[in-house]
Amino acid sequence: MKMSGFSIEEKVHEFESKGFLEISNEIFLQEEENHSLLTQAQLDYYNLEDDAYGECRARSYSRYIKYVDSPDYILDNSNDYFQSKEYNYDDGGKVRQFNSINDSFLCNPLIQNIVRFDTEFAFKTNIIDKSKDLIIGLHQVRYKATKERPSFSSPIWLHKDDEPVVFLHLMNLSNTAIGGDNLIANSPREINQFISLKEPLETLVFGQKVFHAVTPLGTECSTEAFRDILLVTFSYKETK
């Protein structure tokens, strides 16, 4: 991926200093062909099945294993997802199982470039322990809201993630959607920043230095509104 005018080292320093980072979508859309690849990726969200663990959400999840002694990413047969109660007071403490992400989405060159970019960025930080085997998790999530039923994230309020580095890529947002904005806080009682991602592939990166939350998604229209995201998470492979 070409990164004209983008210094990854400077952005990593900014991220480590603040605990979060905004990344423009231009970094992912510099090639003309990426616009059509984005459209293909967006269409896949219409096929997501409902999230069994939360209303008004649809979701799929797959994960790669990156072993220390290999440059390759190996698609894991397991798509179990676990968060501790400490970090997710709504759904933590239990193993959640989601449908796997479609091969067409995983093999989309744009998505593959995004995962490579996220991995390179994460590896340049002083946060990731490069001596451990990594899990690179991909979460496709569609938040679906109607006039009577808003859609909530999990957990619904300020929290930190289990994973030391998390990328949030906005994939699509209907123009009838209200909310779905990101809050950044230095403590659970102090909201310091309000960030609205509006354009596809606008991105936020979170570490464990800050708390963050997503406001509920709603709409005033009679038709359903949606917000589609791709989370790319970095954590360590379970030891047995």
From Swiss-Prot:
Use of this protein: 4-Hydroxyisoleucine is a natural nonproteinogenic amino acid that exhibits insulinotropic biological activity and increases glucose-induced release of insulin.
Keywords: Dioxygenase, Iron, Metal-binding, Oxidoreductase, Vitamin C
Co-factor binding comment: Binds 1 ascorbate molecule per subunit.
Binding-site residues for Fe cation, renumbered to this chain: H159, D161, H212
EC identifiers of the protein: 1.14.11.45
Gene3D superfamilies in the cross-refs: q2cbj1_9rhob like domain
A Gene Ontology molecular function term of the record: ferrous iron binding
Record InterPro entries: 2OG-Fe_dioxygenase
Enzyme class: oxidoreductase
Chemical reaction(s) catalysed: L-isoleucine + 2-oxoglutarate + O2 = (4S)-4-hydroxy-L-isoleucine + succinate + CO2
Cofactor section: L-ascorbate; Fe(2+)
Cited function: Catalyzes the hydroxylation of L-isoleucine to produce (4S)-4-hydroxy-L-isoleucine. Can also catalyze the hydroxylation of L-leucine, L-norvaline, L-norleucine and L-allo-isoleucine, as well as the sulfoxidation of L-methionine, L-ethionine, S-methyl-L-cysteine, S-ethyl-L-cysteine, and S-allyl-L-cysteine.
Sequence similarity: Belongs to the iron/ascorbate-dependent oxidoreductase family.
The protein's name: L-isoleucine-4-hydroxylase
UniProt gene name: ido
